[in-house]
């Protein structure tokens, strides 16, 4: 019996029941690959949620970017409130990989900034996979990178159970070995403290504290407590505290690894000396010996990931263990927007290896550093279990390997039809576009515009803004999480028009958008290929008045095929509605994203330069501080403001006003980031 409980205010409709039945039968019969060819807005996520619930298997849902992963995770958490729906993406806020540019003799050291909240979510995902069998992990493509050794990670966990006797000193040593740090004053994730007969731990996978109460050597109680107020949140009978880092190396393995690194170093030095590369030999010897000394003394060094093959005991060229290896044997892989995601699998490995090759050739790293890498495409498929591809426009490869198991889902439960598509000449297109935007704005509807170049998008945004259109420009330099926020603002009506280049196609769930505009639709190429056009047109497929405007002076084959496919689907939908007396109804999705809120990564640009939320929650505190000429908080005032806000936060917590205390905590976190910059 399935351990999943699917909660939804509606039942499968249209061709969802047929798609669910076929997919479930395919999974249960052991079919390796299936493709759900679902038009935009037909409820593909709900269909997959039903498949997961009926098959009862742990599932990995793979998305091609963080924005789409957050959206999927949010939807699945609403469908499965009582099950473990986890979020696993890259934990870097900023990442500059190690590199060397031979032409200019420039070495670039690795620099990065790890987001603690995302790191916690990653640990939560692996913990759930060890402890539960009702787990759905929504991940970005970063899940194919090495993630330690699951068996060692599990083996290293420290277990506590009520009624058991423990050696406290031994348990503390085990926590330290698992990279937890003792801090009796500032407790948090990855830290622990001891006060009398109470041990408190900040586990890597949770923002709550674990309090272990002792009576002599016996564990009397295990509780979850609030880290700010100390309020008891839950009582437990037993708990496993997993390592603070996924990469765990036992002492005996570390000794062997150091020996192996020394042997490889000797071989590579002999090679460089034989080739007359004395500078490379000297550079490699100096760097590696320093790293070896650090490994001996503290078990860690900067760039330790480059020795991952030796530390994990893998053979040369063997694939690293990643998130997939934390799953049990019988699991389900779901690849969303597969026509994009599958191609990423190949690109990730190739890009990584070209950079590593230069570092190795010039003596910055040992050859084994090349094995600190993402999975190759074939290695990924060797590890994958049964797979369901999802896309409105599947790639040829997915269609080929899913031959005989391609399930089409065209009918929308809402009865909404595919957009009407109209082609207009480019002459006078901007003025014509402005009229269309004003008409949609009067109806409180939203507009998406896609251009071919960044320059054109910028110029169009400026022009529309000058003509009193509330418009934003979405471009590639915007942080992934901020992108989610911009899309949320569009849905909430903060502005009416969103302009972009290649950011408005796959996966964006925008029921408020009634008009999609494609400029230069007749310029053949990747951005105006058949699949791209179908995907872009589909952004207006959730609105009753959905329409797509293609500005072009010629009629390309891609345009012809995209329009024909849209009209084919529209005819099927219209016929179904007539036969079943269905009147199209607008989609009523909430414009919220709990993942975005949880990550504490809001970077909203305030129109007046002052954080209005900060003013609202902190009362008059902000008014007492000076502002610079740009109406922003002067940097020299930040430390004092942070102190004041911390005082108010503690008072709010003491007064049991936890909501306000949490808001103040978030703002303090943001201000500290500004101070660091």
From Swiss-Prot:
Protein localization: Cytoplasm
Top-level taxonomic group: Bacteria
Location of the UVR domain: 639-674
HAMAP family, alphabetized: UvrB
Domain notes: The beta-hairpin motif is involved in DNA binding.
Keyword Mitochondrion part of the UniProt annotation: no
Subunit structure: Forms a heterotetramer with UvrA during the search for lesions. Interacts with UvrC in an incision complex.
GO terms assigned for molecular function: ATP binding; ATP hydrolysis activity; DNA binding; excinuclease ABC activity
Family: Belongs to the UvrB family.
Residues in Helicase C-terminal domain copies: 429-591
Cytoplasm keyword on record: yes
Assigned keywords, A-Z: ATP-binding, Cytoplasm, DNA damage, DNA excision, DNA repair, Excision nuclease, Nucleotide-binding, SOS response
Protein name, entry field: UvrABC system protein B
Main location: cytoplasm
This protein's GO CC annotations: cytoplasm; excinuclease repair complex
Domain Helicase ATP-binding: 25-412
Motif (Beta-hairpin): 91-114
Lineage, uppermost ranks: Bacteria, Bacillati, Cyanobacteriota, Cyanophyceae, Synechococcales
Residues holding ATP: 38-45
Gene name for this UniProt entry: uvrB
Biological function: The UvrABC repair system catalyzes the recognition and processing of DNA lesions. A damage recognition complex composed of 2 UvrA and 2 UvrB subunits scans DNA for abnormalities. Upon binding of the UvrA(2)B(2) complex to a putative damaged site, the DNA wraps around one UvrB monomer. DNA wrap is dependent on ATP binding by UvrB and probably causes local melting of the DNA helix, facilitating insertion of UvrB beta-hairpin between the DNA strands. Then UvrB probes one DNA strand for the presence of a lesion.
